[in-house]
Structure formats: structure tokens, C-alpha cells
Amino acid sequence: MATEAQSEGEVPARESGRSDAICSFVICNDSSLRGQPIIFNPDFFVEKLRHEKPEIFTELVVSNITRLIDLPGTELAQLMGEVDLKLPGGAGPASGFFRSLMSLKRKEKGVIFGSPLTEEGIAQIYQLIEYLHKNLRVEGLFRVPGNSVRQQILRDALNNGTDIDLESGEFHSNDVATLLKMFLGELPEPLLTHKHFNAHLKIADLMQFDDKGNKTNIPDKDRQIEALQLLFLILPPPNRNLLKLLLDLLYQTAKKQDKNKMSAYNLALMFAPHVLWPKNVTANDLQENITKLNSGMAFMIKHSQKLFKAPAYIRECARLHYLGSRTQASKDDLDLIASCHTKSFQLAKSQKRNRVDSCPHQEETQHHTEEALRELFQHVHDMPESAKKKQLIRQFNKQSLTQTPGREPSTSQVQKRARSRSFSGLIKRKVLGNQMMSEKKKKNPTPESVAIGELKGTSKENRNLLFSGSPAVTMTPTRLKWSEGKKEGKKGFL
């Protein structure tokens, strides 16, 4: 039990010394989740798209790479793996036949040194990386060579796939560091692959521009980081995994440079030939680009904690792809859509505010209009029977064909319910207080209710005028019969 407790405590202790280690997921230990931690991977949809639809994923990433760096047709074809890399001096990677033959021989022997990179090989090499993380303060680490005899013993053990007890004191840190460099140097191609060679040269040339649009000599770090993030996304998975482990180790080593005397640039000089340089070339072949390659390697070491996160717009594109939405092809598309959404929201908010502000004013105007009309009709109603009174009543009935000023109903409301907001209907609703109307009809009288009220209280002449002049009024047989039965004894409402 003590052994188990000690082994369980080793991981936090080891991680506590590596506070800046790369972490691509977040663990949530919520007590309400029955003690089961939930892992949130921000690049979940990116990884899902990479594994399930590699062609779509590659097209998405490459289209954004070409937005940042200029790749002519041949270099773009090299990045896509359609043509082989052409190097100065006629040098080039070994032919596919010889590479396959050499790999087959090594595979038969079960060796990992000199074989194509695999996850099994990375698992063996990880023992070296893990040991070096505990010995970062050794002066001259990765620069001082170790003992060749001990290195051969260690090499054979790794090729045989046996677990090695590096804590026994049999091996020195310099032995392990040198063997790690040997492993990288014997890979069939550099860790960053031949296909990406020209792209890394272009990334090293990304410089800032001044206010006049002229290119300066100041590196554009943000664009370089973004381009490297994209480029690392299309690396083969074994290469990407080992590169992540290696850069993290070198980053932690450079942080202890006050003890080990190894800065990021010094480490870049040690590892650029194994990580970036194409195979079968010399320093003379790369004399024009050797400074760029070394500086590029140093830049990757310094910013390694940012390089293995997918850009936010790539995450969004991958997420939208699986949510059934339109997939944007670049960062500019997403920025444009976000801008459109913001403007639409602001416009809708402004329109809503205007409608709210105008409602009290409209209601107040309508109230004053209704009060004035009610007083006017009450005055006409109180007049003695005369020709003048009948003439005024006819004028009120004619106004039933026009709508109340300032209260134009919408087209959809007219088509749906065919309501009429006329002067005559409005007056009769306020003055007569029709008991047959519901509370809702008191505010919006229908043409049928207007017609019924007029039939009950108007003379035959006015009824003829009303029905002949108002095409909006319709009478059902039931209501017409009811109204005719009531007209005896009620000749008029005046």
C-alpha cells in the first residue's frame, strides 16, 4: 500500500516542477458529477475532423497557411506531398525504394534507431525525455558528449524494447542527452519532414510592416506563431507528438540556462540539423538559409507552449462543421460573419428602442382623438330633431369609409381579421356602449359589429347608405335576421 501511495504521489510532484508544460485539455473535478472528472479538450472538434475527414481538414488548414505565407505552385505542391523536395547542390532525400528496403531490414530486427517514426518508438524514447526532465541543471546538457560505451548499451536496450532503470546511476545525463540527439539524427527524414522545409523558410521571413506599408526588419511574432500552429496541425501524428515532447523539454532546459549554460539559441544550434535540415545535405548546401533555420528553431523553443494549440478560427470551423452549419474557409470569413451579427443585433436593438419610445406618444394621441370625437357626437346626439341633425348623421356615416388618422392598420392585420377603425365605429363604441361587444372588440370593432349597431339605430336611408358604400361590411344570415326582428319599435337611435 505504501508503494502504491508513493507511486500515485510521483505524478503531482513531477508535474509541480513543470508548471509550464503543455496541456491540451482541462480537467473538471466537480463534486456534483459523482466523483468522475470530465475532460474538456478545446481542440476536440479539430482532432475529430482531422481523423474522420483528413482531406477536408488538410484543405482548411492549407488554405489558411497560404493566407499567411506566399507559396508558389511548386512549393505548395511540396507542402501537399505531390512533388519531392529539390535541394541545392543536387542533394535530396533517398529514393523511396532504398528507404523502404532499409526500413524493412530494421523492422525485422525490431530496432527503433534509423526506422520511420512510430508510436512504439516514441514510447521507448520517452524514457530518455522523462529522465532528462529531472536533470536539467547539468552544465552543458546536449552539448557535452557522453561515454560511447554506455551509450551503446543504452541503445541496444532501447532497440530490444526493454525497460531501462535510468535512476540506477549506471548512465550519466550526457549519455542520455547524446543518445536522444542520435535517435533524431538517424530518422529517415527530419522531424518536421521534407515537405515542410520551404514553408519554414517563408515563416522565418515574416516581418512587420510600418505605417506606410513598407516591410521592416522586425519579426512578426504573432503571424509566425499562427503559421507554425497551422503547419504543425498537418504534421504526421507521430512527428507532431514527438515534436511536442521535444520542444517542451528544450523549453524547460532553456529556463534553467543560469545552471546549465544552454540558452534557446544554443539548443537550436544542437537540434536544428535533426529537426529542420533535410537529410543528405551539408552546411555548405544551406549556407544561405542556415541562419534562418537556426533562428527558426530558437523561435520554436521559446514559444513552444503556444504552438500546439489550434487557432481559434480553426476550432470554430471544425465545430461548425459538426453542428451542421456552413463551414468557413478562413479567419476572414469568421471575422466578417461576427461583424455582420454584431451590426444586425445593434440595428434590431435600435429599432426596438424606437418602437418602445413611440408607443406612449401614439397612445396619448389616440386617447385625445377619441375624447374629442365622443364630445362631438354627444353634442350632435343632444340636438333636437331637425334637418341639420340628419345631415350631420349622414356625414358621420360617410366617414365609416375612411380610417382614423394616425392609426393605419398593417396589411397583415387587415387581411387576417378585416377590422375597421372608422370614425363612426369608434364613436358608437364610446357613446352607445354596445353590450354585445367583448373587451377586445371595444378597442378594435369589427365591420360586422359596426353594421349591427347601425342597423339597430339608423333609419332606412342611412342603412342603405352604409351597405352601399362600405365594401368591408359583411352580414351573416343569422345576424341579419336578428337585426330585422329588432327593428320594429326601434326606428332610430336619435
Curated annotation (Swiss-Prot):
InterPro entries the record matches: ARHGAP19_RhoGAP (IPR047941), Rho_GTPase_activation_prot (IPR008936), RhoGAP_dom (IPR000198)
The gene behind this protein is ARHGAP19
- Site positions for Arginine finger: 143
Stated name of the protein: Rho GTPase-activating protein 19
Q: In which tissues has expression of this protein been reported?
A: Strong expression in fetal heart, brain, placenta, lung, liver, skeletal muscle, kidney and pancreas. Weak expression in adult pancreas, spleen, thymus, and ovary.
Composition bias type Basic and acidic residues, residue spans? 354-368
Q: Where is it mainly found?
A: nucleus
**Domain Rho-GAP: start-end pairs:** 102-308
User: Which domain of life, per UniProt?
Assistant: Eukaryota
Q: Where is this region: Disordered?
A: 349-368, 399-421
According to the UniProt entry, which residues carry N-acetylalanine?
A: 2
Q: Does the keyword Nucleus apply?
A: yes
* MF terms in GO: GTPase activator activity
Q: Which CDD domains match?
A: RhoGAP_ARHGAP19 (cd04392)
Gene Ontology BP terms: regulation of small GTPase mediated signal transduction; signal transduction
Quote the SMART domains the UniProt record gives. Answer: RhoGAP
List Phosphoserine occurrences by residue: 7, 31, 422, 438, 470
Record keywords: Acetylation, GTPase activation, Nucleus, Phosphoprotein
Task: Give the species this sequence originates from.
Answer: Homo sapiens
